[in-house]
């Protein structure tokens, strides 16, 4: 059995090094991509969900993951945010939710014990209990790092076909994962430092960079940015992301807003 990684001073220093990494396209093709600034519609806030951190549309509603610990997932009516189901999960500081193989898949971005590596959870959508879990690859440190920082795991998750995409900011990558084994199928470079929500759009992958208040459309073959949506400073900050009928929706864990691009 593969030994799970431990948090250590070596890991902390590795995180410092990773934080300085600049994407390979930062001074090249990214400067040439099309930038749009659509209007943001602030739709609603969900009662009892104060820090919505990711979104997943399903045929009978919209799943919203609340970051307040321990995390609850709310299934709501997309048109008005009225609650259909409330699910208590075992996730801590969760930042990603998706649905596939009859289960919810949730990124437990932190753990109750900070020395424990963050994990990705397969969750029973009726009980909220964890069915399986795997150590999240690429977990570590990013952004403003101090000795008191704790490792950060996955942020956005999005099911595509028989696998799911996962954004892990500390790694500087987006991983395509085999769900039932937790193994990496492949990876592509992330479009920014604080990558978050993901959405699948007719063979292309949208990815949020929360720090830049931007959403990038990527070629999932190699991570090349094709389009950039730039939000304004007074718009809610993008965290979670999904797409419905060709329209991007996002949520902001800081303000609580569920938003849609117009």
Language model regions located:
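A short helix->beta-strand "capping" segment at the edge of beta-propeller domains
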Residues: 32-48
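A short beta-strand motif characteristic of beta-propeller blades
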Residues: 40-45, 82-87, 131-134, 141-147, ...
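Short loop/turn segments that connect beta-strands within beta-propeller blades
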Residues: 77-80, 124-127, 178-181, 219-223, ...
């Amino acid at each position: 059995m593969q030994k799970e990684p431990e948090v250590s001073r070596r890991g902390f220093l590795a995180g410092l090094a990773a934080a300085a990494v600049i994407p390979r396209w930062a001074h090249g093709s990214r400067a040439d991509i099309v930038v749009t600034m659509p209007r943001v519609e602030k739709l609603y806030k969900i009662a009892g969900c104060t820090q919505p951190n990711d979104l997943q549309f399903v045929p009978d509603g919209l799943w919203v993951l609340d970051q307040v610990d321990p995390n609850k997932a709310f299934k709501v009516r997309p048109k008005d945010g009225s609650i259909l189901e409330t699910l208590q999960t075992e996730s801590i500081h969760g930042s990603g939710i998706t649905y596939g193989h009859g289960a919810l898949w949730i990124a437990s971005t932190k753990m109750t014990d900070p020395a424990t590596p963050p994990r990705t959870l397969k969750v029973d959508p009726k009980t909220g209990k964890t069915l399986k879990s795997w150590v999240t690859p690429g977990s570590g440190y990013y952004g403003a790092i101090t000795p008191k920082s704790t490792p950060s795991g996955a942020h956005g998750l999005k099911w595509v076909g028989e696998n799911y995409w996962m954004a892990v900011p500390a790694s500087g990558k987006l991983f395509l994962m085999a769900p039932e084994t937790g193994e990496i199928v492949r990876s592509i470079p992330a479009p920014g430092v604080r990558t978050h929500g993901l959405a699948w759009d007719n063979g292309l992958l949208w990815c949020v960079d929360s720090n830049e208040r931007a959403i990038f459309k990527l070629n999932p073959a190699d991570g090349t940015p094709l389009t950039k949506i730039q939000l304004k400073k007074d718009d809610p900050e993008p965290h979670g992301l999904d797409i419905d009928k060709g329209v991007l929706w996002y949520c902001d864990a800081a303000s609580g807003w569920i938003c849609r691009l117009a």
